[in-house]
Amino acid sequence: HDADNEKLQRYCSDLPSTPQNLRLRALVALFLFQGLRQIEVVRLDVGDIDLRNKTAFIRGKGRDDKEPIHLHPSTVRVLREYLNCYRFRSGALFRSDSNHCRGDRLTTKSVREIIKRVFAKLEIDGSVHGFRHFFISKLIKSYKGELLMVSKYSRHRSIQMLEVYNDEII
């Protein structure tokens, strides 16, 4: 997985900085460096991103309340480029650029399709959820199995769910 993620990062950074490619880089950063769920990414609004304080406010799975997360420096950089390009002031952070629904909020299905096309091009066998799995596995390793800390940073309510990841790693 490390090699695939490095290949994906290299591919994204080598792309010309077109609006579509900037959107792809931002999506990949939120999945890879933040471990966000697909639903958390598509629910993001422009107002949820605070680049000055390097935070984002995430509306979790099945929740209406938003919780702050710290943004990785790479995520801050690509989000800044993305927002400077699109100049969105409010509303959905990620929007469709297809002809029949241009400007609408991206759906989880459309995000999966975007990522699936890139994976196919790079011959990566994976899924969008694989990013989250990778992120959580990294957290478990860096916190040496301290699942309370991992649950905080992964926004996993269930320690039992994290034990599944932990058992795979240890």
Residue ranges of model-derived segments:
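Conserved catalytic core of the tyrosine transesterase superfamily
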Residues: 1-170
